[in-house]
Structures are given as C-alpha cells and as structure tokens.
UniProtKB/Swiss-Prot annotation:
Pathway: Steroid hormone biosynthesis; Steroid metabolism. GO terms for cellular component: endoplasmic reticulum membrane; mitochondrial membrane. It is a single-pass membrane protein. This is 3 beta-hydroxysteroid dehydrogenase/Delta 5-->4-isomerase type 1. It comes from Mesocricetus auratus (Golden hamster). NADP(+) binds at G10, A11, G12, G13, F14, L15, Y155, K159. A bifunctional enzyme responsible for the oxidation and isomerization of 3beta-hydroxy-Delta(5)-steroid precursors to 3-oxo-Delta(4)-steroids, an essential step in steroid hormone biosynthesis. Specifically catalyzes the conversion of pregnenolone to progesterone, 17alpha-hydroxypregnenolone to 17alpha-hydroxyprogesterone, dehydroepiandrosterone (DHEA) to 4-androstenedione, and androstenediol to testosterone. Additionally, catalyzes the interconversion between 3beta-hydroxy and 3-oxo-5alpha-androstane steroids controlling the bioavalability of the active forms.
Length: 373
C-alpha cells in the first residue's frame, strides 16, 4: 500500500468531491486523479488548492472514451467509480443513461484490466435493491436478504446491471498477471451541503412562498450524510489493499447508511430547512394508490406521444414507489468488513446541511427581490 495512487471518476459531483477531499488526507497516497466530463471552474480551483504532499491531477474526459480511460488508469492502484447519470424523472434519454452507467462501467473495467489496476470500488445505489412496490416493507434490511430491483426504468436497471458486472469481474486476470479485486457500495439517499436534489427542492420552495413540496410523506428511509458515504469509499480503498481484510471484501456489496433517524423524505426536508422559515405543503394529497395509477396513465400518455412529441411526465410509478415506501438498511456488514463507523453524527450533519440551506434561501430570496423590483 505504500506509495499508492487513486483514480476517482465523477470527481466533480456531489459525492466525488467529498471523496477527493478525504483522499488527499491519506498518508501513503502519492497521487489522486480526478476525472469528470467537465469540471466547474470553482471545483477545479478547489482541487488545485488541495495540492499538499498528495498530487492532485484533474482530468476531463468521457466515460465512454475507452482510450481516455486507459490513459487515466495507467499507474493507478485503486479506481473509485462514482460517475453516473442519475435520473428518476425521465428527463434523460434511456439510451444515454444506459450508455453512461452500464457501458461506461464496462469500459472502465476493461481499462483496469489493460492497465493492471488491482482494486475497483463501484458506487452503486440503494435503487438496485428496490423497492419494487409501495406496499413493500423493509426495516433494517441487510446483505444476506434477497432484494433486487425489478424495474425496467433506465436508472435502477443500468445501476443493477453495472453492479453485477463489477462483482462478476472480481478475480479477473490483469495484463501484468495480477488479479482484479472489486466491491460495490450501495449508499442510501445521500444528503448534505451542495446536494443537487435538495437544492432543487429548496429553490422551488423559496419561489413558492416558503412551501415545501410534499412528495414522500408515506416513506420511511434512512438517508446517509455525504461525508459518511465518502468515508465508506476511503475505507473500502484501504480494505481492498490490505492483505488481511481484502479476502472478506472481494466480490461483496455493502449497504451504506449512518445514524440519521429513520424518517420520511418530506420530514427530512422539513427538519433540514425549518430554521429558515420553510414549511411543508398542508393541502390535500392523493393516496399513494391513486398517485401510482396516475403515474401509469402519465407514462402511457408519454409513450403514445413519443413519435410526435417528447412529453416528460411530472412523476411516474417508479418515483411514486421510491418516495412512499418503508425501505431502510443496516450498515453492520460494512462495520464488520470495512471497519466503517459514521464520521459525522446526525446533529452535526443536520446543522451543516441547515446552514448551507440558509445560504441558499438568502441567495434566492435576493434573486426574487431583484426580479420583483
């Protein structure tokens, strides 16, 4: 492990940035390569400021460009693959999502074989496990239970197939005669400062007189704070390189949660934003069964219009199910094999996220005031 190097794909993303910040603190790490299709100028600047004893190399390239991936993997010890097209709303074309999430992962695995990279960590998703029905109830689920998404929607399907490919690649022969070892992490819904989904929710609420959308009040989930999700990746990178720990980790997947209280998505949004005057919509909400069938009708309309018009429904059956199901998982296996313990407790995570939300509220209130003038 002395003098190791790490490539992080999707490094400009919400989770990827946190992983980079933590990696540069690793004592034996010589170089971290941050790969993404495009980096925002502020992200690139932040990574440049991280230059300490660990060299930070920023690379822009496409996950579908095999030559780019092969160059990025040269001389690398560990790949952490977070890059993905995340979409449960139907905004991104199906084939684009499958190309990025599945074909991109296959390209990266092949690049690892050709460049003789011995360790590969895949950022999977809780979506690969389901839920498949809003009537399904899973409380403190674990890896020994059989939970697999049956949705054909492109995001859960592509992530599921990519995870299967990653775990199947464990034990593959590398070009230099070595062996590839892989594992996958399945984080719960990730929240925290700079969350793209929370940003959209808060900005919409500010524009709607401080009223938060109510979309998931019937759910019970256990979200994970972004720093804790990132920390699990660091531990996986250490573990796959540790001869004592690696045999237990190879070819395995892990649910990654923390000590955030079990609650609905709506309750989480409210708890994180209530200090800034935001409140949930108290108007009548249709029952889940009705929303589910409305989602089916909207999907049908979208399908029928597809030859002449690209209609994107406001919601679909998959989103209704995701947002209104009891679906929580334990991190005990990660605790046992990776030595995972959450770095940040719930109160600190809540305060950090709430403070960031406050800055977002003030920023967009100012925008509204400017427009009003």
């Amino acid at each position: 492990m002395p003098g190791w190097s790490c490539l992080v794909t999707g490094a400009g993303g919400f989770l990827g940035q946190r992983i980079i910040r933590m990696l540069v603190q690793e004592k034996e790490l010589q170089e971290v390569r941050a790969l993404d299709k495009v980096f925002r100028p502020e992200t690139r600047e932040e990574f440049c400021k991280l230059q300490t004893k660990t060299k930070v190399t920023v690379l822009e390239g496409d996950i579908l460009d095999a030559q780019c991936l092969r160059r990025a993997c040269q001389g690398i010890s560990v790949v952490i693959h977070t890059a993905a097209a995340i979409d449960v709303f139907g905004a991104i074309p199906r084939q684009t999502i499958i190309d990025i999430n599945l074909k991109g992962t296959l390209n990266l695995l092949e690049a690892c074989v050709q460049a003789s990279v011995p360790a590969f960590i895949y950022t999977s998703s809780i979506d690969v496990a389901g839920p498949n029905s809003y009537k399904e109830i899973v409380l403190n689920g674990h890896e020994e239970q059989q939970h697999e998404s049956t949705w054909s929607d492109p995001y859960p399907y592509s992530k599921k197939m990519a995870e299967k490919a990653v775990l199947a690649a464990n034990g593959s022969s590398l070009k230099n005669g070595g062996t590839l070892h892989t594992c996958a992490l399945r984080p719960m819904y990730i929240y925290g400062e700079k969350s793209p989904l929370i940003s959209v929710t808060i900005i919409r609420a500010v524009k709607n007189s401080g009223i938060l959308d109510v979309t998931g009040k019937f759910s019970t989930v256990n979200p994970v704070y972004v720093n804790n999700a990132a920390w699990a990746h660091i531990l996986a990178a250490r573990g796959l390189q540790d001869p004592r720990k690696s045999p237990n980790i190879q070819g395995q997947f892990y649910y990654i949660s923390d000590d955030t209280p079990h609650q609905s998505y709506d309750d989480l949004n409210y708890v994180l934003s209530k200090d800034w005057g935001l409140r949930p919509d108290s108007s009548w909400r249709p029952p889940v069964a009705l929303l589910y069938w409305l989602g089916f009708l909207l999907e049908l309309v979208s399908f029928l219009l597809r030859p002449v018009y690209n209609y994107q429904p406001p919601f679909n059956r998959h989103l209704v199910t995701l947002s209104n199901t009891v679906f929580t998982f334990s991190y005990k296996k990660a605790q046992r094999d990776l030595g995972y313990e959450p770095l940040v407790g719930w109160e600190e995570a809540r305060e950090n996220t709430s403070e960031w939300i406050g800055s977002l509220v003030e920023q967009h209130k100012g925008t509204l005031n400017t427009k009003a003038q």
